[in-house]
Structures are given as structure tokens and as C-alpha cells.
Amino acid sequence: MSVIKKIILLNLFIILFSATQIVAGNLNILFKNLQNAQNIHEAEKLEKKIWDDWTKHPNSKYLTNKLENATYSMNHQQYQIALKLFTDIINEDPKWAEAWNKRATLYFLIGNYDDSLKDIEQVLNIEPRHFGALSGRAQIYLSYKQYEKAVDDLQQAKTIYPLIKSAKSIEVIKKIIKDLQI
């Protein structure tokens, strides 16, 4: 390989690595601010910014566009198309948490909870602060009547995002657990 090609490749690597670091740094700031949000309006604005970051691939506009197309298909009940697109994205970049999360959502929508849980595990391995994945897994645990696990996930989501709306159901679920023990 020529010296010029090596320099070009090195520069591309540096640019891509830098973009990834900027996104990670931005997310860290957003999560810190989310934990300290004083009201729901402020928290929801931060939540939207986090989702915006999660749904944008750090290095590939192509993958971002593909995720948008897959999400559109999912939202319009074109589930087979969406599944293929989400799976293609995961195969192209298995370290992009949001691709796994979107496919987990699709599996949830079509009632395939076991595969949804598997994808949620991947999401949380990549991005442990993914309050959306935690809330989604809690919904699945509720459908399986695994109430303690649902509470654990909702409490974990609340630790990350203290004003998250899904945390309001924690006390209701705890009451269900208590009633079942009687």
C-alpha cells in the first residue's frame, strides 16, 4: 500500500474515531443533565436529544437513513420489510445499540417477546443507560407476570432518568406483587 493511501486511511480512522468520541461525550453530558432535570419539561427535552443521538449512527449517514426507513416501515405495519432492514443494519454494525433496540421493538409489536428480550440484552450490553430498552423489557416481564423483574427494570430506568413516566407504574406493580402474596 502506498504511503499516500496509508495516510488517507489513517486520517479517515481519526475522523471516524473522533466523531464517535464526540457523540459519546455529548451523551454523557445529556445523561448527567437528565439526572439533574428539575421538571418534566426539561427532562423531556433532554430525552428527545438523547433519542436523537441514539437514532443517528455516529459514522454513517447511510445507516441512519436505513434505520429511518426501517422505522417508517415498522410504524406502517410493514413488519417483514422492517425486520429485514433492522437485521441488515445490525449485520452491518452490530455495535449500534439503537438498531438492536428498534428490532426489539418490532419483535415486541408482533408478539415475539423472546426475541425481543434477546435484542434488549444486546442493547443493554452496548448502552446500559438505555431507559427505553429497560422500560420495554419491563413491559415484557409484566406480560409474563414476572412482576419483580419488571419493577427492577423500571427502578433501574428511574435511576437513569428520574422523571421517566413509566416509573409511575412501580407502586402499582408492587401492590400487585403484595396482593399475590396474600
Q: Each predicted region: which residue ranges?
A:
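Alpha-helical adaptor scaffolds
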Residues: S60-I126
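Register position in tetratricopeptide repeats
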Residues: N75, L109, S143-Y144, I176-L180
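N-terminal leader/linker segments that initiate helical-solenoid repeat arrays
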Residues: T20-E68
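Canonical tetratricopeptide repeat
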Residues: K102, G136, S169-I170
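Residue-level recognition of tetratricopeptide repeat
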Residues: W96, H130, Y147, L163-I164
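Terminal, low-structured helical/coil segments at or just beyond the last alpha-helical repeat
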Residues: I29, K56, D152-I182
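Residue register within tetratricopeptide repeats
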Residues: H41-E44, Q80, D114, E148
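TPR alpha-solenoid repeat register
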Residues: A99, A133, S166-A167
